[in-house]
Amino acid sequence: MNASDLIRIMQFGDSVLPVGAFTFSNGVESAIQTGIVHDVATLKGFVLTALKQAASCDGMGVVAAHRAVVADDRDGIIRADWAVNNRKLNEESRLMATRMGKKLAEMSIHVVEHPLISWWLEQIKNGNTAGTYPVTQAVVMAAQGIGQREVVVMHQYGVAMTILSAAMRLMRVTHFDTQHILFELNHDIEKFCDIAEIGDINQMSSYVPIVDVLAAVHVKAHVRLFSN
């Protein structure tokens, strides 16, 4: 990998990329409020579950969309996007995916200036597609020539860091703890990338009941710091 590709991966994979990720907790807020997550070990377990679920759903969408971009199959990109959106059962998850996806597209047209990204944002604004974050990420990175494996790694990193960053503000956990968790999950992320690279939207699955139960709890929560 050349330096140019690496810096682009670092830029667009940055946890402080201005797409609004800081407003979401990926479900960990409710998990902490209900006591499911209460220490470093349970936080690590929650992140692991989220990464596995992301690989078998959003990650496959990333790969399917990336392959469609490479094949210049724009209908395929839209199919992958709706497949991701339709498997998000709770409203908060759909809100997170589409809001961040649109923000990424809006930012990227000013940074990358690629006709495919402009087309993609137009499809989102016209309601022709949902504009989910995983598929938008695939479109933006594939347009820059970044490989599908690297984009899946970016997505997995984003899922983990969204949860860990939120946990820092919600429970007694240190920066050292969260970085150690992320480092320990490296081998698992490698396996999850293999799952995602199946890339078949017909095999996508979002079945993790605890996530939807926690989302329902979050909607009715009296105090909420995050949007999901």
Swiss-Prot record:
Keywords: Chaperone, Cytoplasm, Nickel insertion
Cellular component terms (Gene Ontology): cytoplasm
Subcellular localization(s) per the UniProt record: Cytoplasm
Single annotated GO MF: nickel cation binding
Name of the protein described by the UniProt record: Urease accessory protein UreF
Role: Required for maturation of urease via the functional incorporation of the urease nickel metallocenter.
Family named by the database record: Belongs to the UreF family.
Organism: Yersinia pseudotuberculosis serotype O:3 (strain YPIII)
Assembly and oligomerization: UreD, UreF and UreG form a complex that acts as a GTP-hydrolysis-dependent molecular chaperone, activating the urease apoprotein by helping to assemble the nickel containing metallocenter of UreC. The UreE protein probably delivers the nickel.
